[in-house]
């Protein structure tokens, strides 16, 4: 008989599906509940209720209560052996307290102290896995079964493919103000390079003028990129930029692994994780804008080889979601 897993997490870049697929299908049966932090269950009705509401805070409160009722109803009907919660920022404490017949796991894919609702779940978990290594010791005071666990990549999606490398510089991700400033400076410094930035920022119903203007922008592309599309873009790029959120201290983002999984060349801002785990590999890191600009200048002047088979082999062997799921199951 297969072990039943109920996986609950935010709908973001298909991470829930990637984690679910990492469970061995011969041994595990996985049911997924995707959610949105503003309107709970992902369906058209909830979106209408939220966006048409005159008081969105109240609407969100009601929709998240509805989500928690749905989670408990699913739990009671499905009767999982393991509840695997990713982030869990919208899951109520009382919801977890009623999950008495299962092993309950929390995995954070960003800093837990930026998610106060997630912190409230810590003492109710059988094990907690954290994005930030610096968060482990403080959280251990509440739950001794707390471990550092970085993200990973889905090796069924991110892989090397044979396509023409027609993009010089590529960035995919959320455009915070600091990132926009850096990318604009980068384009101004290297105007002859083919630079592409993908991020869904504007919707017609919210900002019609900015949306229409974005249709004519050939650099900042107003588009959500699926994981499959991201893999193609990484393979097309000569240089993939990776900039971590300012909140990241030690933790490394999933794109670090996804770009390497596509066997693409990555220029990434320096993080201690890279020193600790990849010191004997040629990871291209920078600490300042000046260093990044010089790296790009040298790359497009000398055009050194991009493929690194040894690095790709390391990533594929140790940093897939299958590796992470196996580690989690060992701990619980």
Residue ranges and their predicted role:
Residues 300-332:
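A charged, aromatic-enriched C-terminal amphipathic alpha-helix characteristic of glycosyltransferases
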Residues 82-87, 97-111:
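Active-site proximal beta-strand in glycosyltransferases
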Residues 72-76, 96-98, 114:
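Catalytic alpha-helical scaffold of carbohydrate-active enzymes acting on polysaccharides/glycoconjugates
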Residues 58-80:
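An amphipathic, basic-hydrophobic alpha-helix
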Residues 282-289, 298-302:
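Conserved acidic donor-binding segment of nucleotide-sugar-dependent glycosyltransferases
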Residues 2-53, 64-70, 86-90, 95, ...:
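Nucleotide-sugar donor-binding catalytic core of glycosyltransferases
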């Amino acid at each position: 008989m297969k072990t039943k897993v109920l996986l609950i997490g935010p709908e973001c870049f298909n991470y829930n599906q990637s984690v679910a697929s990492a469970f061995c299908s011969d041994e595990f049966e996985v049911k997924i509940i995707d959610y949105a932090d503003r309107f709970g269950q992902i369906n058209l009705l909830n979106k209408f209720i939220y966006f048409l509401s005159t008081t969105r805070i109240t609407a969100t409160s009601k929709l998240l209560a509805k989500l928690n009722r749905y989670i408990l109803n699913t739990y009671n009907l499905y009767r999982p052996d393991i509840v695997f919660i990713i982030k869990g920022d919208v899951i109520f404490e009382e919801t977890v307290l009623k999950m008495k017949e299962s092993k309950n796991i929390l995995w954070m894919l960003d800093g837990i102290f930026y998610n106060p609702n997630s912190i409230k779940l810590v003492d109710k978990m059988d094990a907690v896995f954290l994005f930030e290594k610096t968060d482990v010791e403080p959280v251990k005071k509440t739950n001794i079964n707390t471990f550092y666990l970085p993200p990973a990549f889905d090796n069924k999606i991110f892989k090397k493919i044979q396509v023409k490398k027609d993009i010089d510089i590529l960035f995919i991700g959320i455009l915070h103000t600091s990132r926009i400033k850096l990318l604009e400076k980068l384009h101004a410094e290297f105007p002859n390079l083919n630079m592409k930035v993908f991020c869904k920022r504007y919707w017609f119903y919210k900002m019609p003028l900015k949306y229409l203007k974005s249709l004519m922008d050939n650099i900042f592309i107003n588009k959500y990129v699926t994981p499959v599309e991201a893999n193609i873009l990484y393979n097309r790029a000569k240089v993939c930029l990776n900039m971590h959120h300012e909140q990241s201290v030690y933790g490394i983002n999933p794109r670090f692994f996804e770009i390497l999984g596509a066997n693409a060349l990555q220029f990434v801002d320096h993080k201690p994780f890279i020193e600790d785990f990849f010191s004997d590999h040629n990871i291209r890191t920078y600490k300042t804008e000046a260093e990044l600009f010089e790296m790009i200048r040298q790359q497009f002047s000398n055009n050194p080889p991009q493929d690194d088979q040894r690095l790709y082999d390391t990533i594929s062997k140790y940093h897939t979601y299958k590796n992470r799921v196996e580690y989690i199951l060992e701990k619980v």
